[in-house]
A protein has these predicted regions:
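Phosphate-handling catalytic cores of nucleic-acid transaction enzymes
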Residues: 1-463
């Protein structure tokens, strides 16, 4: 154990960060130190800081590196992330801080564009020799916060490395998903996540745009009371919610401000170190194809141990899915976990490289292990959100029946309990069971048998 690792462990214990349940130790030691300083001196939640940084790292890496999953399947590291919490928990500030180096990078791109535009306009005005061959400069952007579908395609076409969508209130983005007629935003966001190409071939365009391998990150915030809107059937049934990593801290307490003279100095130093890491990731470039010399993404393969761990984990999921008899009982969200884990592993490998703590020749077992833990954390967050949404949406009589039943029960027991305790008919009890299943509070184990859905914090039905 080196000095930095020891220091991080001491600081984590001193600040009780282990109690948060967030697996901070999966990140590089240098990054852990930065996150701890931001949490302590910026009064932020460790969950929000770390996952915002993961999103920013993905935006910087873009399409330059991809991870090989199996056969012809490889993927970039694009993530859809939502930071959930009550008002005043400080969701937006750490997101802005994590993306500050990205904004600075964009400012440099803007300054370069303005300089080149001045040269172009001057050449055109004086009609210098060769000015007709001079291409008009194009402004490259990395982040978007308000856009149309056409604008998204155009901006990504101008910056094939990748685009990051930042929305302070994520439902503001999703509210636009119904206004595009035959080509809705929601369907595009689904296909983008899956790696399907983007194109804009409207007649009014001087030149059609096509992005063969889109890399679009999405990160935003929302309040806990609005999760009910996000878990509506429109987003659940389409599979959009399956593609989202949910970040929801266990503790709802707002951190106290610390009256320390050097807090701003410590936070500024942490921000500078983070900017250095993002700068190194931005410095990574495409590979060159041997036959055409065109830019091609670098493909990283898992080493033997990483491959064994990843495939073993996924095959256990497959075994559990294959054991389910009723198609309606299959949890569609699980089917996206392999993509989430692969993408997070690629990011952790790149971050460890940028921190000088590993290589970037392959994906090692540490990155896979870290990705599995982060995916599990985000899934627990999602399940806890689903628990309180289910409590709100399920009617009181259905919940009362559930409180009276054991963790596992059969139809006969439910009917008897309903008749003896609630004085309702068999048909009414079956309607209650349908309501409980619809709300996600119970699942069908097999025909005639049901189980209560348990969440990380206990049963979804706890009071």
């Amino acid at each position: 154990m080196d000095a930095l690792e020891l220091c991080n462990k001491i600081n984590m214990e001193a600040e009780s960060l282990a109690d948060s349940g967030f697996p901070l130790e999966v990140f590089p030691q240098k990054m852990q130190s930065i996150i701890i300083d931001m949490v302590v001196h910026g009064n932020f939640k460790v969950d929000y800081v770390a996952m915002s940084m993961l999103s920013a790292a993905s935006a910087a890496l873009g399409n330059t590196y991809r991870i090989h999953v199996k056969q012809d399947w490889d993927t970039n590291a694009a993530l859809y992330i939502i930071l959930v919490g009550r008002p005043g928990m400080g969701k937006t500030p750490p997101l802005q801080l994590a993306y500050k180096p990205i904004r600075e990078y964009e400012r440099k791109l803007f300054d370069k564009f303005c300089y080149e535009l001045d040269l172009y306009e001057a050449a055109c005005a004086t009609k210098e020799s060769g000015s007709k061959e001079m291409k008009k400069p194009i402004l490259k952007r990395v982040t978007l916060d308000d856009f149309t579908l056409e604008a998204l395609v155009l901006e990504h076409y101008n910056n094939l490395r990748g685009i990051a969508i930042n929305y302070d209130e994520i439902l503001g983005l999703l509210a636009n998903t119904d206004r595009y007629g035959k080509n809705p935003m929601l369907e595009r966001l689904l296909s983008i996540w899956s790696g399907c190409h983007l194109e804009n071939t409207r007649v009014k365009n001087d030149r059609p745009q096509r992005v063969e391998e889109p890399c679009v990150n999405i990160i935003g915030t929302t309040q806990t009371k609005r999760m009910k809107e996000l878990m509506a059937s429109k987003f659940m049934d389409t599979g959009f919610l399956d593609r989202i990593l949910v970040v929801y801290p266990k503790s709802k307490k707002v951190p106290h401000w610390l009256d320390e003279e050097d807090s701003h100095v410590r936070q500024s130093e942490a921000s500078r170190k983070w900017a250095d890491i993002i700068g190194k990731i931005f410095g990574l470039d495409y590979a060159r194809c041997n036959d055409t010399n065109e830019c091609c993404p670098n493909i990283l393969y898992m080493d033997k141990d990483a491959h064994s761990l990843f495939f073993g984990w996924w095959n256990r999921n497959v075994d559990a899915i294959n054991a389910i008899e009723d198609d309606e009982d299959v949890e569609t969200r699980v089917m996206k976990h392999n993509t989430h884990v692969a993408r997070i592993a690629l990011l952790l490998q790149a971050l460890r490289y940028a921190c000088g703590e590993s290589h970037l020749q392959s994906i090692d077992v540490d990155s896979i292990e870290g990705a599995l833990r982060l995916n599990e954390y985000c899934e627990n967050c999602y399940q806890r959100c689903r628990a309180f949404v289910a409590e709100d949406t399920c009617d009181s009589m259905s919940k009362e029946l559930l409180y009276l039943l054991e963790d596992s029960f059969d139809t006969k027991t439910a009917l008897k309990t309903g008749m003896e305790n609630l004085h309702v008919t068999d048909r009414t009890v079956m309607n209650y069971i349908k309501e409980l299943m619809k709300s996600g509070l119970i699942t069908k184990a097999k025909k005639g048998f049901y189980e209560k859905v348990k969440f990380e914090t206990g049963q979804a039905t706890e009071t």
